[in-house]
Amino acid sequence: MSRTAGGSTRLLLGLAAVAVAFAAADTYVVVLALPDMMISVGLGIDELQRAAPIISGFLLGYVAMLPLIGRIADIRGRVPVLVASLVVFAFGSLVTALAFDLPSVVTGRFLQGVGGGGLVPATLALVADLYPVERRAVPLGVVSAVQEVGSVLGPLYGAVVLAVADWEGIFWLNMAVGLVLAAALTRLGPKPAARSVVEEPAEASVSKPPLPDILSMLLLLVALAALVLLLWEPPALYNDVTLGLPFVPVSGDSRWFTPLALVTIVATVALVARCLLAKRPLVDLRSWGASFGRADPVGATILALALAGVILAFASADPSQQVFSPIGGFLLAGSAIAAVLFVWHLRRARNPLIPRGSLREMPAWASLLVSFFVGASLIAALVDIPVYARLTTYKDSQLQAALVLLRLLVAIPIGAVAGGFLTRRLPAGVVCGAGMVLSTAGFAWMSQWGAHSLENQIVTVPLFVTGLGFGLALAPVNAALLASTDAAVHGVASALAVVARMVGMLVGISALTTIGLRQYFEALRRRPGHELAAALVQIEAIFVGAAICSLVAGALALVLFSGAKTRAAPPRREGANAASSRADRA
């Protein structure tokens, strides 16, 4: 792919960044819609623990499938994977919007996670394809900034939609935007070269693009229409004596035993068969299957199991009560076994998921370590700043508590862009280390807050400084990783960095909350009845722990990113060039 930053290149990258931002917004939008979603699937507001799979299902799809998607992006190309991810995201949004019970909601959210997660490594790898090493830090910073803007606007986006529509409207809009972006990327993306151009140039010059396979399109329409009717059950049809017969189960009471479900399954199977056998299929499943086979599905499955155990152990726990879920010990033991098996598999596989030597350079594997500690620190801000606000000044306003966090979040995209520009001029380790020092200072300041600190506007300073520090670290971490790995593994390497950050967030919130809870109960033991004072001690301990994580991330970056060649080589002085030339002649 061309490395010239022309108009089409910028537009292509811009669309990919918008897709990443939209998926990031969807990550947070469900927070507002969750109560209504719970009621729609028959759960009470007090059954948050049973609704946990709605969150963990998305995380599972987002994280566990990332390495496989990143590897496929290396094999098949960035734009095809971006388009496929958007289609999966749109289909997951459709399933979620039409969901009728908890399993269908979780399925839809899982598919949304798979699609949304696949956008990030493909976009980062696309930046590396389009820009040379010395020029990619700024676009990496812009992509990171746009992603963080999406995270900031996610709750606002959800609130606006919920003000005029039900929660399903969020996911209908997600589906529409996903399909529009997929169509735009398809049109802008590189076209495969036609084999007939060399052999028959005259004919190729006047030939028209082949028509899509009509039968495949008809089967797709039938399958989608049947699925929509199956999930929706429109009353006008469902309650009719004759037209309602396709909705009546032939056995039991499950929708999946109705004639309409049979039509959905048969049409889907026929569509898959047609795409495998047709000369010009609607979706080239044979080619995608070959790419999937080369991406090491066995290794990806083992790694997904290892990640799934970690995600389910921590994401389904109540941090206020426990480090991980009641079965978390068994899940983590299973993850450990899967991790050992994965390492053994990588050593023996012919085409491993992570090609041998991919992360041999120190800045490459160091980027994963830094991402882990950045995630562990960041999650403390995202979770505990609103908690602190609700405990103290804004006891009755979740909105005001969220606006306190917004003062930190708005600084992250600013820092991300600034970090991109700075990384073009300074070593990546210095920029990342400086950012993490700022975050450390911000957390240290916040750890001194008392019961009335939010009444003083000076609290905006540590919030903004902390967010700015996190933003500064984003571009140099990605730049160091991409500069220290081969282009053939940029997709899977970027995916591993995202996975490291997400796992760091999950482990971090559980570990820091556990430390905070110990301080809370110790404070209560010393001063019984002073719950607010004990809660402030808990928050203080969490912020101190987050400051330590930030400091560790900065120190690792400063030391281990030293060999990352993220800048252009400085021009040699004219005198030095002349001396070198004379030495060569001698």
Predicted regions and their residues:
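C-terminal module of multi-pass small-molecule transporters
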Residues: 65, 76-83, 134, 400-573
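Small-residue-rich segments within alpha-helical transmembrane domains of MFS-like 12-TM solute carriers
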Residues: 24, 28, 97, 113-121, ...
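Intrinsic disorder in cytosolic terminal tails and internal cytosolic loops
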Residues: 1-8, 193-211, 282-289, 560-586
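Helix-loop-helix hairpins in multi-pass membrane proteins, especially solute transporters
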Residues: 74, 79-286
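Interfacial helix-cap and linker-helix signal at transmembrane-aqueous boundaries
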Residues: 37-38, 72-73, 157-165, 389-390, ...
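Glycine/proline-centered helix-kink
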Residues: 31, 121, 151-159, 307, ...
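Transmembrane core module of solute transporters
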Residues: 11-38, 46-56, 295-300, 312, ...
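Structural signature of transmembrane alpha-helices in multi-pass secondary transporters
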Residues: 23, 55-62, 89, 113, ...
